[in-house]
């Protein structure tokens, strides 16, 4: 049962804290902290002492709970701790393949080479990891060492779909991943949204020469996330911040943190007031500024400042334009569809149900420029 604050002892607080991390006991939480701290500090001696004293740690998740970072050797592979990896392998660690996959998706190529020399080999579907993290160097390494460009079921479109739909944001890595896919024989559509995905201003210049209305054109979800490249029919599985369906190229640039392309679009006359299309149920009509507020680049730690919002506001973006939006987040505790009717960019951020997605720096700047709820 529940313990009142007046009755609680230190041991009760310790147990509650351990369980909040998904661990059964305070001593197990302490061990997890000691192990992960030692790996981060590259303290092979402490890691060795812990494993000798508690041999089961060699095969349990380093954090003590279920985690894709894995047991200590795999955990070390994520951050390139080669000395610790070699020691743990000698001590009997068996998670060689998982460690190899983690090194590749984190771009730790020296570590991946070490694990390859130990006998790890690219498994079918292993390229999906670097595609998820947009790690072009890890992707190229796997392909150079014989990896199949497919998921575990052999679907050759799955990797490129992952690059386009992943939660990760890393413009340069994404551009290079798509070029690697093209080198693997994937035919990327010659569309303007794909030119943005690829970071190709040269291709956008060609599109603009052929289509004077390009900069104000609204693009459907399917044009942004092509089904023929394996992109999902469930739009919510394309992991963006503010909805992109029906948006302009400027909307797309904001969500993928394509600052250089956005600047080029504005120089070419893109309208910061351009609104996304409104769907049959009345949702849409938002400008690119909304995407600076509920932001996937902010969510993943890439864009913590207000510079994208500043770019748009400096070009005259209206801080009090209104729109109605709806959003379903995925792979979170609450996956329900939420609706936000008649909100400003500031109101969109103020009311959004997951504040981890809301760029507070952008909100402050919008408020300074006269934005209100």
Report each predicted region and the residues it spans.
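Intrinsically disordered, low-complexity eukaryotic regions enriched in glycine, serine
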Residues: 1-49, 53-54, 64, 75, ...
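Hydrophobic repeat-domain scaffold segments
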Residues: 17-18, 46, 194, 200-211, ...
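Ankyrin-repeat boundary/"N-cap" motif
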Residues: 31-37, 60-75, 94-105, 121-133, ...
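Short coil/turn connectors between adjacent alpha-helices in alpha-solenoid helical repeat scaffolds
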Residues: 40, 165-173, 296-308, 354-359
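Conserved ankyrin/ankyrin-like repeat signature
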Residues: 46, 83-84, 110-111, 137-138, ...
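Ankyrin repeat domain, specifically the short helix-to-loop turn at the C-terminus of the second helix
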Residues: 51-57, 86-94, 113-121, 140-148, ...
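Terminal, low-structured helical/coil segments at or just beyond the last alpha-helical repeat
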Residues: 350-373
